[in-house]
A protein has these predicted regions:
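Active-site beta-strand->loop->alpha-helix modules in alpha/beta enzyme cores, enriched
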Residues: 2-145
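The feature marks non-catalytic terminal segments
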Residues: 118, 147-204
């Protein structure tokens, strides 16, 4: 029974995402993207974990590459974007769908939707080696026509220069406790990125 419920739940998540993608171009005609900065994240919670201070400062248009068809995590992502006051879009990919052509297709499409002067995403090595993060980072590097930033990797992020002030750390922790409650394990498992953030210029 649990498997059936889980299957129906995921199908509903896919349907909602697919309908959103179908009608999103219509909303763009009514309300074109004015942001000059675009941020690509692989999954829900990557936004807060890796790009909290960047989002507060730059106010980017945020693109979620993979919803994973999870209604819970989609709801959490929308709540996070509302907290930051950011415009966003999301796409119908499984959380582990690492097909390069699919990822590149999404990124290419989104890059044509605004006149962006700054692009930001994951590093080519996926921060700690996450394959989906890697592929998103590589695709952004390949396709971005403008200045591009990526996350600092695990072997460098622990330095003092990337350590956040205590109020910023507390805010990130509270965002997970209040919004990304399904991902609370992140606070322990990826603690270094809770307390540190860093971006570096992408060299081509």
């Amino acid at each position: 029974m649990k498997k059936v419920i889980r299957f129906v739940y995921r199908c509903l998540g896919y349907l909602i995402c697919a309908l959103h993608n179908l009608f999103y171009p219509v909303s763009l005609k009514l309300n074109p993207i004015k942001e000059k900065t675009v941020l690509f994240v692989a999954h829900q919670d990557d936004d807060v974990l890796f790009f909290h201070t960047f989002m507060k400062k730059e106010k980017p248009y945020v693109v979620l590459v993979s919803t994973g068809f999870s209604l819970t995590r989609m709801k959490e992502f929308k709540a996070a974007m509302k907290h930051y006051g950011l415009r966003y879009n999301y796409h119908c990919l499984k959380s582990r769908d690492e097909r390069t052509e699919k990822i590149e297709s999404i990124i290419k499409k989104e890059l044509t939707r605004g006149e962006f002067t700054l692009c930001c995403s994951h590093s080519e090595s996926g921060e700690y080696g996450h394959m989906m993060h890697k592929n998103v980072g590589k695709a952004v590097k390949k396709l971005s026509p403008c200045r591009t930033l990526s996350t600092v990797d695990k072997d460098k992020i622990g330095g003092d220069e990337y350590e956040l002030d205590e109020p910023e750390i507390e805010e990130k922790i509270n965002l997970f406790k209040c919004i990304y409650r399904s991902q609370l394990f992140v606070l322990d498992e990826y603690k270094i990125w809770v307390t540190h953030e860093g971006l570096t210029e992408v060299k081509r």
